């Protein structure tokens, strides 16, 4: 996320060693990164949560990250996602437990410890066996709305995704309208790293869940994701999340990033006006834009060009500005890499 305002500052041509170390994730020895330290890292992969309305995308995002992404009053009132939601999750692995029980997120570790109020949360120790926990990677969830009229919002989010979880509810016939449309959107975008999540298995009897599974298999037959794993879960009751994480780790890799790329492109998914009504002109702050960087490095002080810009007399005029601040999640940083 970059914040810009009117400025005459010159473009910075160099960065400090600290900045370079901060963003070159591939040069970090992950075996030495604690889960606490991982909070300061930039997410290295964007994972889309897609599927029909009310199939559990936001609930699953919260179960894995601890963040409920529906934050706007209308979303809360209507009980559906309207805008793209974002949340980071730190994925870790116990060195002692067998698969799939060895896979955790930081949030899952916290909640498992909190089941016993006598225990103190230890992010470096497995809450099940006490074995050492190792950091695997930090990912960002892009929670896309599933309602028909919000398809344009979902498509803007798809441009940010490196992979996706396609959620299909076990208590409804397959496929639902947006299940088909969201899968078609992924195929058009060329996103092939997909895990299919059969959610709400708690809402039906075993025989009905098995029949629903067969419907999913029939639905994806002949598609680009015909061989994608189908993982049955209950996001609401947090059942089978370890299994899901294992398949995410094995089927959705972190894409290769080019930090040296000169054509530095930032795809904008959302924007904010942080100015309060009645703010004097001299006190106006620039807009805030959120999205993902495809390659290269952005630094505070860099000059940027926003396209297509603003429309004047049926023509678009590009906007030029300077980056005043950069935040990754809630952390202010001096520079950011792809992701």
Q: Which residues make up each language-model segment?
A:
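Helix-rich terminal scaffold detector
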Residues: 3-6, 13, 17-66, 137-141, ...
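P-loop NTPase switch module centered on the Walker A-proximal segment
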Residues: 16-152, 161
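Conserved catalytic-core segments of large NTP-driven translation/proteostasis enzymes
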Residues: 28-30, 39, 218-339
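Short, ordered loop/turn segments at secondary-structure junctions
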Residues: 52-53, 65, 147, 169-173, ...
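Residue-level signature of catalytic and energy-coupling elements of molecular machines
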Residues: 54, 60, 79, 143, ...
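Signal for well-folded cores of large energy- and translation-related assemblies
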Residues: 65, 69, 73, 77, ...
């Amino acid at each position: 996320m970059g914040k810009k305002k009117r400025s005459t500052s010159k473009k910075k041509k160099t960065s400090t060693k600290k900045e370079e170390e901060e963003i070159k994730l591939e040069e970090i020895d992950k075996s030495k990164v604690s889960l606490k330290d991982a909070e300061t890292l930039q997410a290295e992969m964007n994972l889309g949560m897609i599927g029909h309305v009310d199939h559990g995308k936001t609930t699953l995002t919260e179960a894995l990250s601890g963040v409920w992404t529906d934050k706007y009053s209308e979303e809360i009132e209507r009980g559906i996602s309207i805008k793209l939601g974002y949340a980071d999750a730190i994925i870790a692995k116990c060195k002692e437990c067998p698969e799939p029980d060895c896979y955790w997120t930081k949030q899952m570790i916290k909640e498992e410890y909190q089941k016993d109020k006598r225990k103190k949360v230890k992010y470096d120790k497995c809450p099940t066996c006490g074995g050492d926990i190792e950091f695997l990677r930090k990912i960002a969830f892009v929670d896309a709305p599933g309602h028909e009229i919000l398809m344009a919002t979902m498509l803007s989010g798809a441009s940010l995704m490196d992979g996706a979880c396609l959620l299909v509810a076990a208590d409804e016939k397959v496929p639902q309208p947006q299940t088909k449309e969201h899968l078609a959107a992924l195929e058009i975008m060329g996103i092939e790293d997909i895990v299919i999540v059969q959610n709400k298995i708690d809402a039906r009897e075993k025989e009905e869940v098995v029949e629903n599974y067969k419907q999913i298999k029939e639905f994806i037959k002949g598609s680009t994701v015909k061989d994608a794993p189908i993982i049955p879960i209950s996001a609401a009751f947090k059942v089978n999340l370890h299994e899901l994480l294992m398949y995410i780790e094995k089927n959705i890799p972190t894409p290769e990033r080019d930090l040296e790329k000169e054509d530095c492109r930032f795809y904008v998914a959302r924007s904010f006006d942080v100015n309060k009504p009645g703010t004097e002109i001299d006190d106006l702050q620039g807009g805030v834009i959120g999205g993902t960087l495809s390659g290269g490095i952005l630094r505070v002080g860099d000059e940027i060009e926003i396209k297509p810009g603003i429309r004047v007399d049926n023509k678009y005029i590009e906007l030029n500005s300077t980056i005043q601040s950069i935040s990754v999640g809630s952390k202010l940083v001096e520079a950011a890499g792809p992701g």
